[in-house]
UniProtKB/Swiss-Prot annotation:
Spans through the membrane: 1-21, 34-54, 63-85, 89-111, 118-138, 169-189
Nucleotidyltransferase in keyword set: no
Main subcellular location: mitochondrion
The entry's keywords: Electron transport, Membrane, Mitochondrion, NAD, Respiratory chain, Translocase, Transmembrane, Transmembrane helix, Transport, Ubiquinone
Top-rank taxon: Eukaryota
Protein name: NADH-ubiquinone oxidoreductase chain 4
Organism: Trimeresurus cantori
Biological classification of the source: Eukaryota, Metazoa, Chordata, Craniata, Vertebrata
Any GO BP: electron transport coupled proton transport
Top EC group: translocase
Function as written in the Swiss-Prot or TrEMBL entry: Core subunit of the mitochondrial membrane respiratory chain NADH dehydrogenase (Complex I) that is believed to belong to the minimal assembly required for catalysis. Complex I functions in the transfer of electrons from NADH to the respiratory chain. The immediate electron acceptor for the enzyme is believed to be ubiquinone.
Molecular function terms, GO-annotated: NADH dehydrogenase (ubiquinone) activity; ubiquinone binding
Pfam families with a match to the protein in the record: Proton_antipo_M
Protein's cellular compartments: Mitochondrion membrane
Reactions this protein catalyses: a ubiquinone + NADH + 5 H(+)(in) = a ubiquinol + NAD(+) + 4 H(+)(out)
């Protein structure tokens, strides 16, 4: 069920990050060097999750692994125990909660019309559902963390924190962001461009689907313009 996937990616997955924040508050502040292996493991896990996204042929699996990769950045930012790192982690959890939930919603709208989640069979929706293509473009741009979205603000905070703590981590972080951009563009081009391979009759996008996307994107844009609401 798509509702379960949306709740899992938007809320339940972020509860793990909240738990790590609470646990780190009772850890000694001066011994951050001992967390270096965990930090490298979190960033390496994010890269592996991103590489797994590039190999996916199932649209829903791709979005699910995308959520996992972003949580790697959240864990790395929390481990350092700085105010900027904590703010960036909280902002990224909120921003990606909206983004991943919106992506799952869009994947379901595609599935309802094609009855398949295979990327190669869901192409050509740009010609059939142009408004849905606009939603796909906006959510993928948020997933890539393009300015002025909240995803960009949070990843900039995390990048600054990691670079100030250990400049070498920028290599792993840069690789992760590059692969994120690659699979997000791959997902958009695979589902929207090209010629449709299925000949079944496609329903137009319904008002409830547009409303659902507005309820995801508008709050995220509002928080992006006024991040003091959450940071």
């Amino acid at each position: 069920p798509i509702a379960g996937s949306m709740v899992l990616a938007a809320i339940l997955l972020k509860l793990g990050g909240y738990g790590i924040i609470r646990i780190m508050q009772i850890m000694p502040m001066t011994k951050t060097d001992m967390f270096l292996p965990f930090l490298v493991l979190a960033l390496w896990g994010a890269i592996l999750a991103n590489l797994t996204c590039l190999q996916q042929t199932d649209l829903k699996s791709l979005i699910a692994y995308s959520s996992i990769s972003h949580m790697g950045l959240v864990v790395a930012a929390i481990i350092i125990q700085t105010p900027w790192g904590l703010s960036g982690a909280m902002a990224l959890m909120i921003a990606h909660g909206f983004t991943s939930s919106a992506l799952f919603c869009l994947a379901n709208t595609t599935y309802e019309r094609t009855h398949t989640r295979i990327l190669i069979l869901t192409r050509g929706f740009h010609n059939i559902l142009p408004m849905a293509t606009t939603w796909w473009l906006l959510t993928n741009l948020m997933n890539i963390a393009t300015p002025p979205t909240m995803n960009f603000t949070s990843e900039l905070l995390i990048m600054s924190t990691l670079f100030n703590w250990c400049p070498t981590t920028i290599i792993l972080l840069g690789m992760s962001m590059l692969i994120t951009a690659s699979y997000s563009l791959h997902m958009f081009l695979s589902t929207q461009m090209g010629y449709p391979l299925l000949n079944n009759q496609t329903e137009p996008t319904h008002t409830r689907e547009h409303l659902l996307m507005i309820l995801h994107i508008v709050p995220l844009m509002m928080i992006s313009m006024k991040p003091e609401l959450v940071i």
